[in-house]
Each structure stands twice: as C-alpha cells, then as structure tokens.
Curated annotation (Swiss-Prot):
<feature type="binding site">
    <location>
        <position position="74"/>
    </location>
    <ligand>
        <name>Zn(2+) 1</name>
    </ligand>
</feature>
<dbReference type="InterPro" id="IPR045867">
    <property type="entry name" value="DNA-dir_RpoC_beta_prime"/>
</dbReference>
<dbReference type="InterPro" id="IPR007066">
    <property type="entry name" value="RNA_pol_Rpb1_3"/>
</dbReference>
<dbReference type="GO" id="GO:0008270">
    <property type="term" value="F:zinc ion binding"/>
</dbReference>
<comment type="similarity">
    <text>Belongs to the RNA polymerase beta' chain family.</text>
</comment>
<feature type="binding site">
    <location>
        <position position="894"/>
    </location>
    <ligand>
        <name>Zn(2+) 2</name>
    </ligand>
</feature>
<feature type="binding site">
    <location>
        <position position="90"/>
    </location>
    <ligand>
        <name>Zn(2+) 1</name>
    </ligand>
</feature>
<keyword id="KW-0808">Transferase</keyword>
<feature type="binding site">
    <location>
        <position position="463"/>
    </location>
    <ligand>
        <name>Mg(2+)</name>
    </ligand>
</feature>
<dbReference type="InterPro" id="IPR044893">
    <property type="entry name" value="RNA_pol_Rpb1_clamp_domain"/>
</dbReference>
<feature type="binding site">
    <location>
        <position position="467"/>
    </location>
    <ligand>
        <name>Mg(2+)</name>
    </ligand>
</feature>
<dbReference type="Pfam" id="PF04997">
    <property type="entry name" value="RNA_pol_Rpb1_1"/>
</dbReference>
<keyword id="KW-0862">Zinc</keyword>
<dbReference type="InterPro" id="IPR007081">
    <property type="entry name" value="RNA_pol_Rpb1_5"/>
</dbReference>
<dbReference type="GO" id="GO:0003899">
    <property type="term" value="F:DNA-directed RNA polymerase activity"/>
</dbReference>
<dbReference type="InterPro" id="IPR012754">
    <property type="entry name" value="DNA-dir_RpoC_beta_prime_bact"/>
</dbReference>
<dbReference type="GO" id="GO:0003677">
    <property type="term" value="F:DNA binding"/>
</dbReference>
Amino acid sequence: MFGEGSRDNAALSKERLFDKLEIGIASDITIRDKWSCGEIKKPETINYRTFKPEKGGLFCEKIFGPTKDWECCCGKYKKIKHKGIVCDRCGVEVTLSKVRRERMAHIELAVPIVHIWFFKTTPSRIGNVLGMTASDLERIIYYEEYVVIDPGKTDLNKKQLLNDAQYREVVEKWGKDSFVAKMGGEAIYDLLKSEDLQSLLKELKDRLRKTKSQQARMKLAKRLKIIEGFVSSSNNPEWMVLKSIPVVPPDLRPLVPLDGGRFATSDLNDLYRRVINRNNRLKAILRLKTPEVIVRNEKRMLQEAVDALFDNGRHGHPVMGAGNRPLKSLSEMLKGKNGRFRQNLLGKRVDYSGRSVIIVGPELKFNQCGLPKEMALELFEPFIIKRLKDQGSVYTIRSAKKMIQRGAPEVWDVLEEIIKGHPVLLNRAPTLHRLGIQAFEPVLIEGKAIRVHPLVCAAFNADFDGDQMAVHVPLSIEAQLEAKVLMMAPDNIFLPSSGKPVATPSKDMTLGIYYLMADPTYFPEDHGGKIKIFKDVAEVLRALYAGGFLDDRIDNRRDETGRGIHIHEKIKVRIDGQIIETTPGRVLFNRIVPKELGFQNYSMPSKRISELILQCYKKVGLEATVRFLDDLKDLGFIQATKAAISMGLKDVRIPEIKSDILKEAYDKVAVVKKQYDDGIITDGERHSKTISIWTEVSESLSDALYVEISKQTKSKHNPLYLMIDSGARGNKSQLKQLGALRGLMAKPNGAIIESPITSNFREGLTVLEYSISSHGARKGLADTALKTADSGYLTRRLVDVAQDVIITEKDCGTLNHIEISAIRQGSEELLPLKDRIYGRTVAEDIYQPGDKSKLLAKNGDVITSAQAELIDDAGIESIKIRSTLTCESRRGVCAKCYGLNLANGRLIGLGEAVGIIAAQSIGEPGTQLTMRTFHLGGIAATSSTPEIVTDCDGVLVYMDLRVVVGQDGNHLVLNKKGAIHVVRDEGRSLEEYKKLLSTKSIESLETYPVELGVKILVGDGEKVSAGQRIAEVELHNIPIICDKPGFVKYEDLVEGISTEKVVNKNTGLVELIVKQHRGELHPQIAIYSDAGLTELVGTYAIPSGAIISVEENQKVDPGMLLARLPRGAIKTKDITGGLPRVAELVEARKPEDAADIAKIDGVVDFKGIQKNKRILVVRDEITGMEEEHLIPLTKHLIVQRGDTVMKGQQLTDGLVVPHEILEICGVRELQKYLVNEVQEVYRLQGVDINDKHIEIIVRQMLQKVRITDPGDTTLLFGEEVNKKEFYEENRRTEEDGGKPAQAVPVLLGITKASLGTESFISAASFQDTTRVLTEAACSSKTDYLLGFKENVIMGHMIPGGTGFDTHKRIKQYLEKEQEDLVFDFVSESECAC
C-alpha cells in the first residue's frame, strides 16, 4: 500500500524479529549438536563446602557458563578485558553469567526412551503410526512383553506381542538368530524407523474409500490425519523415541541458599538427578554383563524416571518430594494458572506502578485523579532526575536521588511541571471490561490515598469502603499519546456493551438533583398569596439569594417574612420569550443544562438523567457532555447537602389496610384448605393456590405502602419516597419489607414455605420469623462467592474463543442478511424494534409502508437513532440487516456487518478488537446473574393473570385455534399453540381478516397467545371494546376437554397398574388418579358415538398425575372436562436460569431433560407403545412422508393427536437441543435461537446487552464444517475444518477440474472452539496444553501470529487497535516522509497509495 523500502524493513525488524513460529519434534542430532553445550554425566549439583557448581554436574560452569560475570571458575581470569577467553585450567568461558539462562546441556541415554507425550496423550501418536493399541504399547515400553520386529524365517507376524514363555518357546523352536524381537524404547524405535509412511498412507486411503461403516471411516480418518501430519512435515516418527534428553538451563531451575545452611531447589533438579542416577547405573550394569532380569528392571526404571521428568503422574504414581508432595515436572511448568503461559507470558508484573486505597474526590474534574505526592515522586523518579540534570541542578544520578530523598523544594517544582499533561492509568481489579482501566491527568495531593472522581466509580465498580486501585505510568511518547487520545475517562462515558451512559450521577448526586427538580409542593394560592412571576432567570436567582438559599452562610429554606422564595414553590418565569410555569429549583438546575437541550421542566429520577446525558451527547458532542456531567456532580452534591434528607423511623408508614388485607388472605387460604379437605382439589393445587394468594397480598400491600409514602405532609416530601423514587437507594421490594410484610420465604432447597412472614421490619419479626429469614441471607452470601468464580471462568472462555475477531476491512460486500423484529411476550413489547436496529447496517431499502416514494433508510446505511424512531413509528414489523453472523470477511469481520461502535456512536474502526469487547460485554454482567436454578412448581410456571382484558376497540380473530363450545356457551381452546388477535375494525369479513393476518398484510393491535383450556368469552369475528374481558385462564389445572359428543370408555386405565384410587384423608372421597407405571399400557379415554361402544369418534391420552373426572359409560357433550392435570402435579421443573444457562448455551451442551422437536411439517398421530416409549408420528399429508419419535412415557407431551406442527416445533416439555435445531432447521434458525436464548437470561435480570456481541460468539461457535464427502480434495471424511479452509480447498480442486467436497455445519461449544483455533500457541495457553503442543509438533504446525494472544506471548505488538497493520504502515510512511518534508505539503502524486 505504501512503498516499503529497506529503511522500513529495518524498522520492522527492530519491532518484530519474526512473523511466524513453527513447532516440530527435535531429532537426536538437534538435541546433541544444536542445542546442547555439553553432556552431563554426574547427578551432583554444587559442592557442599565451597558452594561452587560441581564439574560435569547439573550446574557445571564449563557447560553452562560462569556463575559470576566475567569470571572463570578457578579465578584465573577476572574482569571484562578477558572477554571470550576459555580458561585453560577450568575450561570455563569468560562471559556474562546470564548465559546460564540460555545454554542447554544433554544427557546421553543408555537405551532409547519413549517420550510419554507421544505415547500417553490421546490419541496416541505412536499407537496410530504403528497401528497398535495403547495397552499393547504400554506392555512393550515398560518391558513386560516382547514385540516382533522382523519375523525372519518364523511363522510369527510383525508387531506380534510375545510374553516371556512364548518368547522362550519361539527361541527354542526357531533359534535366536532366526527372528528379531525386542522390548522397551528400543523396540518402538526400530518399529517406527522401519515404518513406510507413504505406502501406509496409500493403503489407508484405499481402505477409507472401500469402507462403508461410518464408525470405521471415522476411525480411519483420524489415523490418516496423524499419518498425513508426519508425511507433510519434516518429522521422522522415530524421533518420538529419545536417545538423549535436553537439560534445561540451570538458572531456570535454580538452587537458592536459605538461612541456616539449607537450600531451596526447583523440583526439576530432583527429577534430572533421578534420570542421571538411573542412567549411570544402567550403563554400569550393561558393561558388567548383568542378568537380563536386572537389566530389564533398570531399563524400566529409567523409562519411568524420564516419564516423571516430562509429565509426572501421567503414568503410574507420581514421584513425591519432601512432605509427600508430587514434584513439578516440565509439563506442569507450562500448564494451568501458574504455568509459564498464563503466569509469565500472558500475565506479567508491571514496573512504574503503585497501588493505594481510594477515596472520593468530589473537587476533581472528570479527567483528573488525585495522586499522593509520595507516590508520584517514586513513580516519576526517572523523569525528575532527567529534568534536574537538564536544569543543571545536579550532575550525577546519585546526587539527584539524594536530592529527591531530601525532598528539596526544586524537586516538587519539577514534579509539578512533569506531571502536567502526563496521563496515568488507573486500574481496579477485577478488570471485567475495558472500562476497568482508564487514563487520568494526575493532580498532586497530600495524604496517602488516591482520589477518584465520583462519576467514574460505576465503570470501575468501585466504592470507598477500602477498595484499592493500581496506578501505571505510560513511559514512551506513543504510550502517553494512546492514553491521552484513546483511554482518557471522558472518552469512556458509554458502555461498549449497550451504548448506555455509564458515567451517570448516582446516590447523593441523584438525590440532590431529584430534590431540586421535584414537583411543586408549595402553592401560594393555597396560602392566600399569588403565583410570583419573574421576568427572567436572573430575577429568580436574586429572589433565591434574598431568601438565603444561594448563600452558604444562611441555612434557612424560606425567609418567614415572605421576602424570599420556596425552592419547590410554583412560580412563573419568562424563558426565551415564553412564560413557563415551573419551580425555582428547576430554574436553578437549567442553568447547567446546555442551551440546545431546551428547558427541562419535569422531575429527574436517575433514569431520566441517564436519558438526558445520552441526548446531550447526541446533540452537543463529547466536550459539552463532560462539562455537563461535572456540573451535574457539583450541583447534586451541593443540593443533597442543603436538602439534608434523612430517614426517620416514622417515615415508614404502615398502610392502614394491612390488617384487612391479611384477614381476607387468611380467609381465602381457609377456603382453599376446605376445598382440599372436601377432595375438590389435590394437595399440589392447594399449595400453588395458597402461594398465589400470598403473592397477590404481597403485591397489593407493596403498592398500598408506596402510595402511602408518596403522600406529602405539610408540603414536604417523605424522605424515604425521595430516596426510592429518585433511584438513589432502595427499591419497592426493600420498602415492602420495611413497611408492609416480608412475604414468602424459601427453604434452603429452594422450595417456597407456604406461610409467609406477615411482620415487617418496622414492627419487628418474631423469633420464628427471624429464623426462617436467616436461610435466605446465608444462601445469598454463599451464592455470591461461587458466582464470582464461575462468572470469571465464563469470561475467560469467551475471550479465548473470540480474541481473534477484529475488524479487518470496511465492507465484505456480502448479500446475506438476518431479519430482525421487536421482542414480544404475549401482547407486551419487551424490546422495541428501534432499540434492536440502532447502529446496524440496512441490507435492503426500507420504505414507508404503502408509500414507495418515501425512503426511510437506504441499503448500506447505518441506522441512526432518528431513523430507528422513524422505522418503528412507521409500524414496520421486521427489517433485514447485515450481521457478523453472515459476514464473509476472510479473517475477522467487516465494519459494515458490525455497525456502530456503541462506545462512541461512530462506525467501528479498522483493527478494533470487537471479539474481546463482545466477550467482556457478556462476561462482565455475569456476577449480576443468578446462580440458582429456579424451582417453579405449579402456578409460577404459567401466566399468573387469571383473565385477559383487551386495551383497544376492534374485532377479535382466532388464529391456529381448535375450539369447542362448552356447556356455558363459551369457547374452550383444545390445542396447545395458538393466539387471539384484536384487529382494527375495517368492516371486512372474518375470512379476509384471517387471510390478511396469515400473510402479514395487516398488523394486529394486540396479540394474546392462548393455551389449552383457556375459555374465550368472545366469538370468532365478534367486536370487542377497550377494557372488555375476552378470556379466562385456568391457573391451577391443565384440562383435558372432550370435543365430540358420545360415551366414555376407559382404555388401559387398569386399577393398581396404571391408575390408583386414592381416598382423600380429610373427606373420604375417592379419586381416580393415573400413576406413573413401567408397563406396556397407554392410558386413554375413548369416546364412542353410541352406548353400544361400536363406533370410535376420538381418543384422549391421559398423562400420569391426572385426575379423571368422568365415569365409564358416562354420556359426555363437547366442552366437558374428561380429566384435569393439576399444574402442581407436573413434576416441578428446575428451570435453569442465570449463569448456568448462559454457560449451557455457549458450550452447546445437551440439556438434561431435552425436548423432542418435529423433524418435518405435518400432523401428529400416535402408534401405540414400544419398550416403555410412546410412538409419536408426524405425517406430512401432501408428500406422505412420516417421521417417528420414540418418547418416554414419563415425558409430558405438549401436542395432541390431530395437531398440525411445523418443522422444529417442540413436541414435549423441556429445553431444545441446539444441535437438533441446526440439523433440522438449519444455521439461521440456530443462530436466532442462541442469540434470543442468551438475551432472555440477561433480560430477566434487567441487563442490557446489544445483540451484536452475542452474534460474534455464536459466529465463533459455527466456524467449522464436518466433511461428509471429501470428493477429490485432500480433506478427510468426518474431519472438522474451518469454513475458510474448506472453501479454499474446494476452489483449488474445482480449478484443477476435480470434484469438490461436501460438508455440513458443526456447532462447537466455546471451549472446543478455542482449542480448535488455527494458532497452537493460543490454544496451548488456554487448556489441554500438552495435548495441543503434541498435536502441533507431530504435524510441524506453523503459527502465523495473527491473533492477539499469540502476539502477547511472543512479546510482539498486538495486531489490533494502533498495532493493526494498516495503522502501522501509515506510521512508517509518515516517518519516512518527515525527514524530507519538514514544513512542506505532500504533493498528491507522492500521497497516492
């Protein structure tokens, strides 16, 4: 793009010495000749008297270099002048001691030893090359059995195993020289060396082509992949067996003297010593011609010692050290949180940093932080020294340091000067999202605590109860520039996850502002006065001043003589030529509001303030918004102080109706108990009805209390109401507990206790009530601790899977899109369309409905908030947008598919790390999610409103409903899925309305999904008016309703097997209940048209737990109840919520009690029972195609015979398996399902996350495809490959005239997707380190260092943000031109790129 000359390459090479990294298996020659500086022959470490390294031992100076700089071992050569000389007496080279960190040695082994990684890591590499099982290999390697290497003249087979007895037999029969059989590493070495990989590869490919069995093909493909890895790489299989072992440099396994003459040593030294001891002993034994049994045992012990060195505990019992602790092997050095990758390469300690406790700094500006003087002196010491030297105050560093320690006056002057314009970074752990590190201008302060601006606390999640923060100093000019331009606090006032302001006033500030902006409480006309009218704002302020309100010396709210003015008095004032009715408080507030926003004349709870800040940013930009935020903070604190709002016990006013409501509730509970005693309802129903009564009481008392405290007394607000309504502290639920009742409590197992706590904290709890409430408090604390760890681990997995998703291009040019609509629950709109489409790119032109001339948004436009409003107001249901799910960028994603950067409202820039932002946005609110699974039994699982009331006038239309007219003339719903719509009355026929609704040609005003048993009070096509009851919902039972007249016959309702008669203890009434059974019975009620039971008209399956309401041979009419299934009888489902549900979704796990879903469109039918499973058939009546589902009898069906189902619709209760959605409905449906399900969890907790973040994670989960037919490509059957690789391979094959491969998409959980990344460095640093490295080494993988993680590990600049390739080139280009053009303009031709 820009001309890159030699100078550029030189600059590049300084910054990055290499741009790829290859890993392979080291051969003996490499270990011996390239890496090693000498052979270690002795196990000794250091001499016990002199403490000097022993010659030829593990710390030998001759091999590894001197222990002191420029000094040989014997002391003959000292000082730098002898540099490079090798001492003729002790053989040590005179050089720096740091070479002891890089020089390696080796141990020459007496016999070949198998590397445990290649043999024990699944799948076993050696096993796959040789075609032998792991157990066979183990017996050979550990000297238990012989293996035939060359059968010679015998009838043995190659690779046949022989035990001692068989071996002796063969020797006796054929003679010792007629065949070759060996044991141990030597045998494996010979077998690997003799393996012809090329012919093996050809043979495997032939077998794969001929094999039909799927299982066998998968097995062959896996082996083929390993063999191909060896063939295509420069590795020889015999290198997996070692003839010499490399020894780590001594300074990486140090021996440190402790006080008292003892030493602390690295475990590696012990492990190496064991290897050397056994190796030396084996060499000695071999020289002495010792008996075979002893030699064999010694060889096995050497193999085990090397195993322990490489991976202790992988084979047999781990080798223990002092205190019975397993020794840390080389593998452990890499693995886990404290391994090399995560401890040292990804998590380094930072110099020029400090930490201290934080306190609030209300006097600071938004971009400032208070830095203690002592801390600043220490952190900026090098800068101070340089400045002091430049000034000529000192000449040496030592004298400058002394001057700083003395605290000379000029030092403080210099420090003040240096700190100006030098930003520092503040960080609070845990850093859950990018707002956890921000840059500030330091202000020097006395004391030892760091001062923080109150408005940035929300971003850091900081409070001042002892929290600590770390300070980091950016040193280089580039780092300072980045901190200033990108990381300053004013640039981070919006959440990257949702675009909502994060820097909003809270607590006292909110209270102060709310108090100032409160509705008028003092009306002059009520006190015999007149409303005061002011000519302008200045006059209002003068009046306030006269009343002492703006004078800090006087603290009376209102001058009693009447000269002054009440802060909440109703007044009139002329503003911008208009007379406005307002209060002095609001006039005071509007002084700080930017003019463009107009006069704010309403109360200001925290939500309103947040909206105002967002509006301010959109209208007047960042700078004015930051000034406004600072003014808000100051005004809020001042007014909160002046208002002096404090809460007293009397402010908690208990509603007078409490006793009446409680009495009524006790009466209702008694009625329910009586119904149970009379046998009308079951125990489950009684429980759920009782709980619903108390829930209702709790809600109505809570509302009554809120109304009570919102009343003003003597024109003053209730302070408690001010605190809650402003959003400063507390909520309705806490208020309910203070002044109404505590309500229902849960047992430790999550079940709800029936009798609620009817006392509140104002009245005080009884001992019993207190003891019940203590469960919840303890559970909360225990949950929080577990939640934090789980949430952190989820974030880590998410970051790992998405870390290489960066914005790599402006526009990928795709034509693909997704369709998006508002999210509704019943008739309620949970998330309007405008919120979902803001900041996304339109995929096709959007016109005003019915008016093609009015274009609302053009294809390729990024939707602004104004456009989003327009589209939503136009009544458009759904629109097509670009998405990262459909982006076709080769690497990363493109800016157009991503849309706006929510943190600043501009189109996302190139190199932006959107993957990590997405992971942080999902992970950061993790701690707010609940950990528990909800135990929702009975009522809570269904809608809790017993009736449906319409809010508008129109015509009622049934859609997808099967109904029957009951005995009372109302319509009863027979199917599980359907809805009733209220549409605008346009005088059309019912058929027309239905047709228009089905084709989405008209919008319904309201939609109510209805389920089985709902009683609809209005007929299909009848008119309804606002406020009319249109349906009743049966809360406590799922009814099974008869839809045809006839006579009852029980089928498979066999007493004692499938049913039981239960005598109600209290009433003596007998109830027939269907029980769970394991027989071949299929309980159902059949309806025959005649009393002779000859003509069958319908059957009804009766689930277990149902109570039968009709008797045999009874005559029934349509709409009659045949049986009822109490909702409490449906086994209490544990609804997995919160964090576990998010983890389940992103890990693509199969839910425990998974639902069955329809594989085709069709009609449901049953075919009896087979092996305790009900056979459900879905038949497509057009094609005649059938799909069978075997459903366990214990599962609850949610469809009936004759129901029409769509592909992907649920047939039974439970959660859907994502993999099935992918298989049946395809990728788009799965993507939609995953995004919506994850959003559902967060929405329940009130957390706002933009869809685009979840889409990025889902994109990463669907990166791979599984090959179903390799065609003429080099891909293998069943292999999982990246889509990019798949398309590339197909393109190459098609160009050569071959047949392309076929594949199906695969859904991977995030852990599996992270491990399957192209970069082996990134995968190894995540999990399964040894397995990943073994796999990579066998195929000589190359890591091109394209992602972030691998570059951090290599110590390179990350290829994102300012390190993105394009930006780096621009930088070089500017550097190159600067020398020639100092103050000249670049001509256009020179600029062309």
